């Protein structure tokens, strides 16, 4: 059966002399594996189009029950190479597609997650800075879409409004609880044994603001470097815990190598 769908390339590996096998996240069929015959041949009209992070409209020969589908055609929509080369942009891209790959279970359609991914990648490939802030914004929406959104407005234990309580008690920090996910007042968190991290009030306010800021207004957010870096690490850890397995070493090694240069 010949089908058309939009797709994001999550991974590509060499196959034989000139072909490649791609892991794709598609709008219509979820995550699937497909072969691009002759895709590494420089003379092929599809050469270079099916690279990690690229977003395309594709044509597949799809057969139910077959493990590997066949790519027939593809039209590139946007790519990390469409902007000036930037190692931080590539590092952010690999973080995003790695987490998406972990979150997907086979050929299960997930249009909200697909729309989130393509929307964020389009912005990522067209912006020149604040990649980490965009990554935090993405993480918050991804965990919400997947159903493990942390409680940010009220204490995850007592239910008290966090901002009002923090102001009344003149708190300098709160606690971010990994499971159940959410932010807690220090007094309530002390009585629990769950894994948790201290979060400063500036970091909490940034987290809360990003949770309600639309993507179109992200440039208006005032974010400190320390708070941004902290939230990146915190939310990645939170995602890994709730996705119930660790990131693929291959993509994380690529990220580490990029950021060290």
Swiss-Prot record:
Pfam families: RecO_C (PF02565), RecO_N (PF11967). This is DNA repair protein RecO. Belongs to the RecO family. SUPFAM superfamilies: ArfGap/RecO-like zinc finger (SSF57863), Nucleic acid-binding proteins (SSF50249). Keywords: DNA damage, DNA recombination, DNA repair. The gene is recO. One of its GO terms (cellular component) is bacterial nucleoid. The keyword Endoplasmic reticulum does not apply. GO terms for biological process: DNA recombination; double-strand break repair. Involved in DNA repair and RecF pathway recombination. NCBIfam families: reco (TIGR00613). The keyword DNA repair applies.
